UniProtKB/Swiss-Prot annotation:
Protein name per its UniProtKB record: E3 ubiquitin-protein ligase RNF6
Enzyme class: transferase
GO aspect biological process, one term: protein K6-linked ubiquitination
Pfam families xrefs: zf-RING_2
Organism expressing this protein natively: Mus musculus (Mouse)
Length: 667
């Protein structure tokens, strides 16, 4: 009796399960049909709007009503973009608001070499930009500067009424600073030249002095960018940073540090004339982005030079200008470099000891170009991401002006470097230790190629994602090193970086990602202080372990790209990864995809004789379906193939490159 009851009960449950399964499949088929019907009825503009903002979803998993709501919401955001501060969809809203102004900025950047001396400006919500171009057609030298001011509180006159401590400058600097006592903008662009070093290790630079360089600086707070996604803490309101500035040590002038030091200054030399740009730093963190076209000599100085001052000369004027707090001369041979710089103190500057470490970033793009020959050979440029984090032992009391302390710092100098190469990215981690201060440096070199002016790179392109993945990995490694440092100190005060880094690299993936997550959380807590670091180059490699990557950090990189909050995205429109690297993910841009032909599927005629199944979703075509045809004549649902082509550049069926058939004109 009992066995029969159990058998009947089991059969009843099985039939109920099968019925539910059939009902679920039927509902999914209905949702798929409604999905395709919705896509078929969309105009080209509405389809691109939803596709570009990742609103299409997956067939069968989203209803047509939800799709319609997404479309209406996107249109509302687009219509209200001038003053929209809605938080309903921060990433999409921000992207829509910045689109028109970003396009105008990019158009100007694409043509600045032909425009001569031109100034352009624009406003977009709480962001304003001002760009100045200076071109010398005869010599081929050019320079430009760009200011992007971000004021989250919309306080245009934030600079007024602030206390500041002056930095001793030359007479020209003082005159220029007095001419601009108050500015309606919260931050200023720092423009300067890269001058060849005349120090002991930079004598080779004297042969190529005076390369005209335009600085391209973007100053702004990254509330929604690096400050959140990278786990970088925000600067507290009472604390400010000081941008490294040029001073004249021959007059005995030094940086004077007050309780709230806000002024910096730099020079730009062009055709023998020097102009100055004042840098004001408010209580918001800075992220300068500097673009310097130039050609200068090579400096082989190590990652930390013991003498704290480098003398520079100008070819035209010959005036000695000394740069405080910078420990190397920057070199670039037709290359493009990006430096993410972490905070550290200027030498000879009063400094308040910190009890914790702190991550602060600065991105610098430098584009090298030979000014001696217009027919110079094109070289594949490279990006260098230089991330640094420093830690001061708690309770350490130091007098920055003490000669004995500086002697101890030099005597306690210790360096070690670990190098690895993966996926076309050359990566180096260096460890620098002085008495009381420990610094970790993560340097990443990314191969790039300059694309033509007609080409357009999407902010969400694979190149940017790859670059930001490397940034994320670098921050994760530095944070992990800072986290394991106390434990390593307890075991051995003399432990070198290779031992710590090898321990991190050889750990399990789960442990690695856990370390990154905990370290990012630690770093995002209140850790103040430290000035902006000077530009530096990686030290010579000594070892080559293979470093593991944090998946959690990689995921965050994608979210940063999609949000479009990093100012580097504007510059990265001009770059793609080098064709020779081995990055496995390559897709087409949205413009290239849109240039492929489309049509509607018809049941009659030729279509009845051709294939009726989309090879991507394995679904039958229905009359009215929008199809996109590749140059190889294979066809697919438009939404299926667009998603495929965003990550791949080949046909899903024949695997032939899509752009090989003459579609390269799509740019």
């Amino acid at each position: 009796m009992d066995p029969s009851r159990s058998r009947s009960g089991g059969s009843g449950e099985e039939s109920s399960f099968q019925e539910n399964e059939r009902r679920w499949q039927q509902e999914r088929l209905h949702r798929e049909e409604a999905y395709y019907q919705f896509i078929n009825e969309l105009s080209d503009e509405d389809y691109r709007l939803m596709r570009d903002h990742n609103l299409l979803g997956t067939p069968g998993e989203i209803t047509s009503e939800e799709l319609q709501q997404r479309l209406e919401r996107a249109k509302e955001q687009l219509a209200s973009q001038p003053g929209s501060d809605s938080a309903a969809s921060d990433g999409d809203s921000e992207s829509l608001r910045a689109h028109s102004d970003e396009d105008s900025l990019l158009r100007w950047l694409n043509t600045f070499r032909r425009t001569g001396n031109v100034t352009r400006s624009g406003q977009n919500g709480n962001q304003s930009w001002r760009a100045v171009s200076r071109t010398n057609p005869n010599s081929g030298e050019f320079g430009f500067s760009l200011e992007i001011h971000i004021n989250p509180d919309n306080r245009g006159s934030e600079m007024h009424g602030e206390d500041s401590t002056d930095i001793p400058l030359s007479g020209v600097n003082r005159e220029h600073r007095q001419q601009r006592p108050s500015s309606p903008v919260a931050r200023r662009t720092r423009s300067q030249t890269s001058m060849s070093s005349s120090g002991p290790r930079g004598r080779r630079g004297a042969r190529r002095q005076g390369s005209v360089q335009g600085s391209f600086a973007t100053l702004g707070r990254l509330r929604n960018g690096i400050g959140v996604a990278l786990g970088v803490p925000r600067v507290s309101a009472p604390r400010t940073n000081v941008i490294n500035s040029h001073t004249n040590q021959s007059d005995g002038s030094t940086l004077r540090q007050g309780g709230r030091q806000r002024f910096g200054a730099a020079h730009i030399w062009e055709n023998g004339a020097r102009s100055n740009v004042t840098v004001r730093n408010t209580n918001q963190r800075l992220e300068p982005i500097r673009l310097r076209p130039a050609f200068s000599s090579r400096s082989r100085s190590p990652i930390q030079r013991q003498n704290g001052t480098v003398h520079h000369n100008s070819q035209r004027q010959g005036r000695p200008v000394q740069q405080t707090g910078r420990n190397r001369s920057v070199r670039h041979r037709g290359v493009t470099r990006v430096f993410l710089e972490q905070g550290r103190e200027h030498r000879g500057t009063d400094y308040t000891p910190l009890s914790n470490s702190r991550l602060v970033s600065r991105i610098t793009v430098e584009e090298g170009e030979s000014s001696r020959s217009s027919a110079a050979t094109q070289r594949h440029p490279a990006i260098t991401l230089d991330l640094q984090v420093r830690r001061i032992r708690p309770g350490e009391t130091r007098d920055r002006d003490s000669i004995a302390n500086r002697t101890r710092s030099r005597a306690g100098l210790a360096e070690s470097t670990v190098e690895s190469t993966s996926g076309g990215f050359h990566r180096t981690i260096s460890h620098l230790e002085r008495s009381g201060v420990r610094t970790y440096v993560s340097t990443i070199t990314v191969p790039l190629r300059r694309i033509s002016e007609n080409d357009v790179v999407e902010p969400s392109s694979v190149a940017l994602r790859s670059i930001l993945r490397q940034i994320m990995t670098g921050f994760g490694e530095l944070s992990s090193l800072m986290e394991v440092e106390p434990a390593s100190e307890n075991q051995s005060n003399g432990q070198r970086l290779p031992e710590v880094y090898l321990e991190l690299s050889n750990g399990d993936a789960a442990d690695d990602s856990g370390q990154h997550g905990r370290a990012s959380s630690q770093a995002s807590q209140a850790q103040d202080g430290a000035e902006m670091l000077a530009v530096r180059e990686p030290a010579p490699p000594q070892a080559r372990p293979s470093g593991s990557r944090s998946r959690r950090q990689l995921g965050r990189a994608d979210s940063v790209v999609e949000a479009g909050t990093l100012p580097i995205l504007r510059l990265a429109h001009f770059f793609l990864l080098n064709e020779g690297d081995d990055d496995p993910i390559r897709g087409l841009t949205k413009e290239q995809i849109d240039n492929l032909s489309t049509r509607s599927y018809e049941q009659d005629g030729v279509d009845s004789e051709l294939g009726k199944v989309c090879s991507v979703c394995i679904s039958d075509y229905v009359a009215g379906n929008k199809l996109r045809q590749l140059p190889c004549l294979h066809e697919f649902h438009i939404h299926c193939i667009d998603r495929w082509l965003s990550e791949n550049c080949t046909c899903p069926v024949c695997r032939r490159p899509v752009l090989e058939f003459g579609a390269t004109s799509s740019g």
